[in-house]
Amino acid sequence: MKLSLSPPPYADAPVVVLISGLGGSGSYWLPQLAVLEQEYQVVCYDQRGTGNNPDTLAEDYSITQMAAELHQALVAAGIERYAVVGHALGALVGMQLALDYPASVTVLISVNGWLRINAHTRRCFQVRERLLYSGGAQAWVEAQPLFLYPADWMAARAPRLEAEDALALAHFQGKNNLLRRLNALKRADFSHHADRIRCPVQIICASDDLLVPSACSSELHAALPDSQKMVMRYGGHACNVTDPETFNALLLNGLASLLHHREAAL
């Protein structure tokens, strides 16, 4: 699996791995790259079955497999210890990495994540699946911003959204791969073993997230033994895109604090 690695800003700089959500594209993190690369070696990637890592995914594709293939790719690149920043599905992959490879994951940042899929989130995906079946990729892509962004943010950026739609259609991961990744997301359940995650965790959520209620992050916070929760009042599901200034400050402060906390505990 292909990874994109930034040059380390100094010798032995900590590594931060960015894991996007269901869309799978590493470019999702573009608003964070410049600030992160000043202090960390940053790893981005298109998830298997998407973008520049094309593949046909098995019907039983799982979050565990997503975590394993990423860890193997990191080890092959010479990276054995790393912090993880995961958004939604990416946060699930991050938790799986922390469970399966505890010696490797130094810190986890969960952005609009959850323990197990909430009934409201499931309802949103049911609607989106019906759109996919009835209207194909175009209907899926055109509806997606409604679940990602606040209405006023979208209304002020209509040309940008049209350009994003065209790009998403041109690089659509395919119906079968999308549904198999979505099914992996829906099956994931960390409610019975989140307390085994021992690395420090920062939880970031947006109170106006339409897709994943912020209560899901409260449940995560209660379940994770070494966690802190930060709530953004605005930004929607893709709060790192819509309000990068606020998000980046939380992210940078969280990484610095938790990595120091981890080092002090060793």
From Swiss-Prot:
Molecular function GO terms recorded: hydrolase activity, acting on carbon-nitrogen (but not peptide) bonds, in linear amides
Top-level class of the enzyme under EC nomenclature: hydrolase
Catalytic activity of the protein: carbamate + 2 H(+) = NH4(+) + CO2
Signal peptide: none
EC number(s) on file: 3.5.1.-
Biological process per Gene Ontology, one example term: nitrogen utilization
Family membership noted in the UniProt record: Belongs to the AB hydrolase superfamily. Hydrolase RutD family.
Biological function: Involved in pyrimidine catabolism. May facilitate the hydrolysis of carbamate, a reaction that can also occur spontaneously.
Name of the protein described by the UniProt record: Putative carbamate hydrolase RutD
Source organism of this protein record: Escherichia coli O139:H28 (strain E24377A / ETEC)
